[in-house]
Amino acid sequence: MNQDDNGKNVVSKVSDLTSCSDFSTSSPVPCLNPLSHENNRIDLIRDLLASLSKEGVVAVYNHVRSLLFTDFTEVFPEEVSLRVFSYLDQLDLCKCKLMSKRWKRLLEDPGIWKALYMQKGWFVNENVLNEFEAWRRTHKFPQPRFENFLKQQNIIGPYGTMFLPQQFIFDSNGRPLLNWSYLYKEHAHLDSNWRHGRFLVSTFNNPSIRFPADQDFRATLDSVYCVQYDDEIMVSGSKDRTVSVWDVNSRFILYKLYGHSGSVLCLDFCRRRNLLVSGSSDSTIIIWDWQNRRPLKVYFGHTDNVLGVVVSENYIISSSRDHTARVWRLDATSPAEACMHVLRGHLASVNSVQYSSKTGLIVTASSDRTLRTWDITTGHCIRIIHAHQRGIACAQYNGKFIVSGSSDLTIRIFEASSGKLLRMLQGHEDLIRTVRFNDEKIVSGGYDGTVRIWNFNTGEQHCVLHNSRNSRVFGLQFDHRRIIACTHSSEILVWNFDDGLDCTFF
């Protein structure tokens, strides 16, 4: 039966239903109205649908769908809709963007992606962010000329930062806004690189790296025991008794500091106070004026190798192979008056020292297998944690957690306030010499020649990084983009996880 025949039959059926002399759409007696029964109406609609073309069925479907499903974004104010969307994760938001043009427009709102970015706890370079906002506020070009202009070229901010077209979206007036969706995507790729071990590795000591022509050295040829860096400089200490100051981006050695008569085993710096502090196997601690490249003070007191040193706003804290840690006043008028406390109690070498200004507590790690916490004001021992089965070689303390590494081949995470063991990580095949952590990850280095990346919250090992000479790893530091580590073979290695990514804002 063709569609025309279907149509004739339906018309006949409707005519029969409505030709009854007693039929009235307003009849108070339901039984006298054939269409008052829902089943009859359903049958009629089925017959009507069967008589329609495909296009007609689609039109009816769309109408019925609109009756069954209500788009909440058309009912609620836009601010409420955005609040609802803010509870979704990245994958769900991307799926929602495919639902309709209206949802796509709403979900390109930068506020949602900014909230997601912040919920992740991801780093934002506040200086660059403020520079962008300062530049944005001073430009009031009309749309579309300004928008088209920005889409075609990079922009230099007031302090020299280059901003790229993909970093912007535009409001209804054509003014640029920061594209938080783009920033989220770039940082998500960066996190994925960390989890899956995607990186580029290079070295500060690579012969392909050019050094300034007026320098008679290229890099240290002896073991490098310690490194520390920020956005501008890196400082390293080595067996050749020197402290090297590098430009962290060009990888040029800017200068060397001479003063120790033994290997430089540890160092720390405070840019706010323009202070660099180093500890040595000659048992001394030197405070350097690194801009004038000379020692300011030399502290004597330890009777063996100085293995750890921390500088804060008011104190220097050091640890030594002589079984003690010491607290030194930075504002002392003479080195003889500088020693504030000698922290005694460990039964073996104190290999690492940490300090948190938030809690006022010092944490020491020793070859006697214990961690100890101390009050910096009184010098009293607050807690002893029997942490490992063998000596502890390294530790970090952030005010809430202590993470330690040992020759028992484990990394352990402790709650600092109670000493409770939270998690134990296994994977290294030799002594764990250095460990660092943040809220998301732990990075460790050991005598097995590896650097390992772990999930702080689950203990899962993400990846293992090797150096070309399989050399012992002595020290490391990391940020959100890279790891820098030093080794027994004199190499300073850099693993970059941000290759090909736009990290302008983080």
From Swiss-Prot:
Its main location: cytoplasm. CDD domains: WD40. Keywords: Cytoplasm, Meiosis, Repeat, WD repeat. It is found in: Cytoplasm. WD repeats lie at residues 219-256, 259-298, 301-338, 345-386, 388-426, 427-464, 468-505. The keyword Ribonucleoprotein does not apply. It holds the Pfam family WD40. Residues 70-116 form the F-box domain. It comes from the Eukaryota. GO terms for molecular function: ubiquitin-like ligase-substrate adaptor activity. GO terms for cellular component: cytosol; SCF ubiquitin ligase complex. GO terms for biological process: meiotic cell cycle; SCF-dependent proteasomal ubiquitin-dependent protein catabolic process. InterPro entries: F-box-like_dom_sf, F-box_dom, G-protein_beta_WD-40_rep, WD40/YVTN_repeat-like_dom_sf, WD40_repeat_CS, WD40_repeat_dom_sf, WD40_rpt. Has a role in meiosis. Interacts with skp1. PANTHER family: F-BOX_WD REPEAT-CONTAINING PROTEIN 7, PHOSPHOLIPASE A-2-ACTIVATING PROTEIN. This is F-box/WD repeat-containing protein pof11. It comes from Schizosaccharomyces pombe (strain 972 / ATCC 24843) (Fission yeast).
